[in-house]
């Protein structure tokens, strides 16, 4: 027994030494921010770095000679997908809810569009090879995250020209459970212990993301979880007190042993009286830092407010974002409409935005109807660099890119007429008709330059839209079938009775006829008059 215990200790020590000498590093970080409307934003980030790794050459995909991959901290299933399809950069986000930029500001992870968004960079010699690999990547990630990413086919796939530049160096959701399996410590230790599915999916907004970036030092995999919780709604009280146990129903009981660093940063509110517990060991630039790596204790970080929370009645001043977006699809008919976008510049300086609109083929743009107004004055000069990819019915979406210029402290309105397509009756979903969801538009601030425009700020996603298409009366065939079946059944029954029954004439004899006739209470003569004669009884 003693020998077995020593052997286990030797294995543990050897594994620790191997981890220290390994080329793989794992870090985790949690950022917490109290919002103006009483909510709290949480941003979990889990980074894994595989040093000295390079992407696979796409020319070697035809040969089955790729070396076997052995990982200690790097997710094996994800590494196999990256090698199998020779992916240079990958971004996948799954979000639910609407991010309120005006009240919450910019998120830590900019990809907050509603639904699923998948971006990948792949090198190749032919378009057919890239299309086949793209389909394989979609199916592989759909199986890995238990998500319906296979529906992101050619009808929902596009290649924007300028909106999504690669972030790394390019060389010469039930989704939460599979997400946690990609972490070295799973959800048994570290910050991942706070990821309670019941509380995350109950948040006002939540999203998970997977980001693979090839850097000069190696490949970096960043797994992120963002959510916005409302402590006032969860607690049922009028105070915005929050803690790990109250919002997640869990605490950080132990640190992840393989993490190089495990930190929690809490952005302290700029106003009000409150108390942060436990006492932060380091406060810098209004942010409290906690190091969970070297502390062997149970962590339940939170804040307490002595007074009741009062909801703000006006927008934050100054504005949390440089511009605001409102997007609508106008029109009451089911064959035509108008796309309307209202942009408000909250700053004094002129602002340029890179505008990307991706619509499924069921919505067609009329570019000659584009109108741009600035403070109710026609200003078509505020739009430039228009790029448009025509949609192909049942095959490719429409992609519209342009640069919009917003004068300082102004409101710019962009309008464009659209046409709504007619679908086949087999293309309508089998469930109740609620309309068709349209993806959000994306706006990226640009810096004005004498040579070119470079990305300046984070992307801003507009709310998604719902379009009402012409829907056939699916109840009419059922009514016709029921009416026809009723008529056929009635006629068939009558004809069947006529053909199967045998009619016989029965003649009754006079005696039997009299016996069978009912007796009468009064006697009558042949003339029908009553008998009035009397007789004596002796």
Which role does the model predict for each range below?
Residues 2-18:
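Cleavable N-terminal signal peptides of Sec/SRP-targeted secreted and luminal proteins
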Residues 16-247:
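Long, solvent-exposed N-terminal ectodomains/accessory regions
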Residues 133, 226-231, 236-247, 252-257, ...:
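Low-complexity, intrinsically disordered segments enriched in Ser/Thr together with acidic residues
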Residues 295-339:
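Edge strands and adjacent loops of beta-rich recognition modules
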Residues 331-359:
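Short beta-strand elements of extracellular/lumenal beta-sandwich folds
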Residues 362-419:
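A surface/secretory-pathway sequence property marking extracellular, secreted
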Residues 417-488:
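Cytosolic-side membrane-insertion boundary helix
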Residues 504-538:
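Cytoplasmic C-terminal tails of single-pass
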